[in-house]
Amino acid sequence: MTIVAVNRCLRQKGFYKTHPEPKLLNWLDLVALGTVCDVVPLLGLNRAFVRQGLKVMAQRKNIGLKALIDKSNITEAPSAFHLGYVLGPRINACGRVGEAALGNKLLCASSEFEANFLADKLNAFNDQRKEIEAYVLLKAIEILEGSPQEYPIAFVSGHDWHQGVIGIVAGKLKERYNVPAFVMSIEADEVKGSARSIAGIDLGALIIAAKEQGLLTKGGGHTMAAGFSLEEDKLDAFKKFAGEYVKSRLGEEKIVPVLEIDGRLSVSGATPALADSLSELEPYGSGNTEPRLMLTNVQIKKASIVGSGHVRCFLSGDNGGSIKAMAFRIADTELGQALLNSGGGLYN
């Protein structure tokens, strides 16, 4: 909207009498990319911008985006999913483990040669980011599961863990254990950390309180995420402070995650026609989440591990119909093991 206002002001002042006026609609692909990757609620104007931006992106006018889409093996028209989970992570990867300016250079590329070269570099940085992230996540899980945990938090640190991935790892630990997660990289001169929270715990308030206690040198954030710095000799004190803070607000009861369901569905009702109907409600994202439907009276005919810890299931319904299903990155979790050992059981 700022660009629209500036454009209107320039027009009113006669600037475009001597300069070509840009067609702002042609830039909506970048607006859509930024809106989705910044997790802006897809409501009102933002939803309209993303919906139209995806149409512009499908026209492949931006040479850099076109190259990145092709290098990412996206063969269908881009969706909000592709922006948030395929293209966005590749652009962000160069800032996490490479050169932050490369993402901007790609989006401003003026030749196909330059665009393809930069897209290849972004893909390489993204692969590197995945490897670093997997290593830090593995070490963090080993620490957490290698000893009893006194507090309802996931609190881990390691020497020279890459700062570009600790936020991602914190998010995955939060999802895995359903507790607030704090992940820190111990550097030569200070400790830098990132945290992710669950409902009911305001991380921003926690960080402010810790700074007031002299435990952190820097820090800030909002309810669900925060970043901070501290001296290494304050790690134990900060862990105790954060643990007591969370414990006092959650109480002694075990945290039980809540899965909200939008509707029930039989296996025979899971059809391409239904998927097409639901696609009319896109773009999905923050503020307009995809419908979550629960399959009832399902028999797991077969379950097996595929890829990097994914579980593929073959399901059948009591009134006919069969479908394939995939559960991503859960093979080593309690749910993954339950699926793999289901033995053809019927689930209501």
Regions found by a protein language model. Name each.
Residues 1-16:
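Active-site cavity-forming subdomains of large catalytic enzyme subunits
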Residues 14-15, 19-235, 240, 305:
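Hydrophobic helix-and-loop "lid/oligomerization" segment in the mid-to-C-terminal part
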Residues 114-118, 125-156, 201, 209-348:
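Mid-to-C-terminal polyanion-binding domains and interfaces
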